[in-house]
A protein has these predicted regions:
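Acceptor/aglycone-binding surface of glycosyltransferases and processive sugar-polymer synthases
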Residues: 1-16, 33-115, 140-155
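Active-site catalytic microenvironments for nucleophilic, acid-base chemistry
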Residues: 13, 17, 124-127
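Short beta-strand-to-loop acidic/aromatic patch adjacent to the donor-nucleotide binding site
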Residues: 19-30
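Residue-level detector of anion-binding/catalytic polar loops
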Residues: 20, 48, 129
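Short, intrinsically disordered, charge-balanced linker/junction segments flanking boundaries
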Residues: 21-22, 40, 46, 120, ...
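Short beta-strand and adjacent tight-turn residues that come in two discontinuous sequence segments
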Residues: 24, 52, 133
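An aromatic- and histidine-rich active-site surface loop
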Residues: 29, 38, 118-120
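Hydrophobic helical membrane-anchoring modules
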Residues: 84, 107-177
């Protein structure tokens, strides 16, 4: 139905095949697969989540149009302000998880129906052990649809409202400040 359903379906198939570590990345080589060993190392060092970041030392946005860079940086800034995130990149789609986290992901009904799913997920996982991994990203397209932007804004505001009224409750536990 939507991009989130595709992510969840892929994670569910991998989960049902009894994998213990999971890497999620964009198709089409917009994410550099040479970063995968760093994700695995971070996950094997006791972190439950590994989040790719284009904005930490060693990361980059290669050949990305200015509007994509702006959207990524602005989305991260807004998430930091409204949701209290400490991550340097809230909009990257390159991430890794332990099996226990994937169980929670596949049993959660995400509010987002688009790529803001990554931001929603990072907010929900903020109390778990995580580390950021520097990644290189090459944007495949300069365009971002109005529908995607509207979904992102409405989901961000909904998460902020949940935070203000006492926290989100679900398979990730209570998520608030």
């Amino acid at each position: 139905k939507n991009v989130v359903d595709a992510y969840i379906k892929g994670l569910k198939v991998a989960y049902e095949n009894n994998h213990n570590l999971f890497i999620e990345m964009d198709a089409g080589l917009s994410h550099d697969p040479r970063a995968i060993p760093m994700f695995l190392r971070v996950l094997n060092e006791g972190n439950e989540c590994a989040f790719g970041s284009r904005f930490i030392n060693g990361g980059s946005l290669a050949e990305s149009p200015l509007n994509r860079v702006f959207i990524s940086k602005f989305g991260t800034l807004l998430s930091k302000i409204l949701l209290g995130s400490k991550l340097s990149d809230m909009t990257s789609g390159f991430q890794g998880f332990h099996r226990s986290i994937v169980y929670k992901i596949i049993n959660h009904k995400f509010r987002s129906t688009g790529h803001f799913y990554q931001t929603e997920l990072r907010y929900l996982l903020k109390k778990y052990r995580f580390a950021e991994v520097p990644i290189h990203y090459k944007a495949p397209s300069p365009s971002v649809s109005v529908k995607s932007i509207n979904n992102s804004i409405s989901t961000l505001l909904w998460l902020f409202f949940q935070k203000v009224v006492g926290g989100y409750r679900g398979p990730f536990g209570v998520v608030s400040v």
